[in-house]
Every structure is written in structure tokens, then in C-alpha cells.
Amino acid sequence: MTQTAVELWQELACPRDHSRLEPRGETLVCEHDHEYPFVEGIPVMVVDDEIPPTQPGYWAKPEQIERVRAAEPPPVEGEAVDPYVAELILGTHGNLYKDLSGGMPRYPIPDFPVPRGNGELLLDIGCNWGRWTIAAARSGYRPIGIDPSFEAVVAARRIARQLGVDDARYVVADARKLPFADDTFDVVFSYGVLQHFSKSDVALSVVDIRRVLKRGGYSWVQMPNALGALNLVRLGQRRFREGDEFEVRYWKPSELKRVFGRIGPTELSTDGFFTLNPQKRDLDLLPARFRAIVQVSEALKRAHAPTTLADSVNIRSVAA
């Protein structure tokens, strides 16, 4: 491992005990001898011996890493879309995008929903192929994307390079055991990710989000509101059970304020109605029947429909 590579990752810390890391060959090692491999420039910082995965089979074990390395496709050229994005589009973007699983004319990269940055360090939790990480970089931030899937992180780096996004960096890591030093980030962002966690795992993630945020920094997390019309229908369809594995968990606004309030002062705002991924920038990619959902959602936002009735809400918490 080159010294230049190590210097790029000065923000990293042991996800188990938060101690500093030092290079040792092709690994990073903490003062308690916990080791983490550096694979082709990507730190692999998961701790699957301490906590079970949030989704079965979603870890970066050595045999999985080797399979990914052996099968990684060549970078696509020009404006073509990496096949990985189409393959995962339903899981990463939701039902409105299901018709794009066979391919799409461009990358569905959204407008970044927080105020434009000026070089602030931002953590994108659950980046997958990097749509929000890329959006953050284009909006003036220095983003680091994390995901527990080595395959996803490799794809994210490949796509960022294709698009000429040089400021994005990626780490294989878990939201509940963030591999960063205390007081590192100006902003912690997550969209469409923590909604798949159990409520106890969200609480664990919130503790670590607060730890890695600088005082006065803030988190911006999208979550589903249990009082939204679409979400009530979906809850009824599964007989109001909590959900398991990668199913969406639905939260009441009071629950969200209580849990995320552990970071600091917390406010909820409307993300959208009748969908958990209302991206108006992607209207040209959607069929008419789904485009109408996003357009209605935008109209309700302009009319200041109550946030308490939105299906998707944003939670902004300032680190106290």
C-alpha cells in the first residue's frame, strides 16, 4: 500500500473501537490488532463477526471479493449506462423504476436535496452504485460513500470514474459500525437505506451517526412515514406486522423525532407522497403512469400538504 493511498484515508478509524489505523502491508491495523484489508484501493471495514448483516448474503467475505474481482466487467464508455445499474434498479430505486431493468438511456442521478456545499466532508450511508454520492460531489461536497457490498462499491467507483467524478471515495462498511474517527463529517446523508433496517438497528446507526458528526454538523436521512396513504395500504397488505430482513419498516413521525433526536434538534420535512423515491429529475425515464405519481407528489408539496401525511419524509438533525 502506498503512502499516498494511506493519506487519502486519514478519516478512517477502527469500526470496533474507533482507534487509529496504521498500514501494514495491504491491510490497515488498529492498536488492538484488528485488521482490515485494502483491496485494489478500497478499504473493506465490515465487522460481520460482531453483528449479523442487515440483509442475508450482503457481506464482503474474502471468497465474495475474489468472485467480484474475477468477474468485474470492463468500464463502459461514453454515455452508456453500466449494466450493474439496470440489474439493481428495482432494489435501489423502487417500483417506479421497474420498467428500466432492461436498460436506460442515462444514469438516474437525482438533484441533491440539501443546500449546496463548499468542500464540506459528507458521508453517504448505503451508497450502492453511488447515485447520491455522485450527486453530492456535483453539489460541491467531498463525499465518502459506504456500502456493505464489495460488488456495489466496486461498481460505484467504476461509474464515478466513467462520469469524471474525482472527488467521490468509497468504503465497504456497515452503518451500525462506522469506520471513521469521532467528529469527522460536516454532513451525514442517507436515502432509501435505513428504512430497510430493523428499528433497533436504526437506533444503533443513529448513535454512530452522532459520533462521527462534527458538533454543529447535521444528518439528513429519508425515511417512510407510517401515516402516509400509500404506506398505510402497504402496512395493511402485510397485516401491520413490523417487517423482517430487507422489508421496509414504517415509522410514525413521533418515533422518528424521538430516535433521531438523540443526534440533536430534529425537524421533519416532506420528501414525497405516494412513493418513497419521488425524483422529479427522473421524469423523462419513467412511463406515463409512474410519471403522474411524481407529478402529483410535487403538486402536493407546492400546496404545502401536511408533512405528517407524506409517505416519504426527510429528517434533519443538528449535532448538539
Question: Where do the protein language model's features map onto the residues?
Answer:
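Conserved class I S-adenosyl-L-methionine
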Residues: V46-G117, A135, S219-E242
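Class I SAM-dependent methyltransferase SAM/SAH-binding core
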Residues: L123, W129-K177
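Acceptor-substrate binding/catalytic loop of class I
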Residues: R238-E255
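A conserved beta-strand element that flanks and buttresses the S-adenosyl-L-methionine
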Residues: F189
